[in-house]
Amino acid sequence: MVQVPKTRKTYCKKCNSHTNHKVSQYKKSKESTHAQGRRRYDMKQSGFGGQTKPIFRKKAKTTKKVALKFDCTTCKTKRVIPIKRCKTIVFMDITQIKKAKVNKKDPNW
């Protein structure tokens, strides 16, 4: 489990300074039906003949690389930065993360 702060002060190229950024997880958008590859695949699939391309079934990885989306609060510029592989990601306030670190050091925790 990875704990990530909801806001982070980091460099913004457009503002040319360190500003506050809102951090969220990047989600894949809906695929376009007008893309050339999608149109080609749909034409190939139509009509008689069944499945034309192999369906991939050998899954090697158990996790995906998480991508974080940074939104600048002043100029609204967005950028996406990947981090390491992890099963779960939790967005917390900085104070909650600091409390969690202090509690881990406590032997009674």
From Swiss-Prot:
Subcellular location: Cytoplasm
Database matches in InterPro entries: Ribosomal_eL44 (IPR000552), Ribosomal_LSU_eL42 (IPR053708), Ribosomal_zn-bd (IPR011332)
Keywords: Cytoplasm, Ribonucleoprotein, Ribosomal protein
GO molecular function: structural constituent of ribosome
Spans annotated as Disordered: 23-53
Gene Ontology annotations of biological process type: translation
Family recorded in the similarity comment: Belongs to the eukaryotic ribosomal protein eL42 family.
Protein name: Large ribosomal subunit protein eL42
Gene that specifies this protein: RPL36A
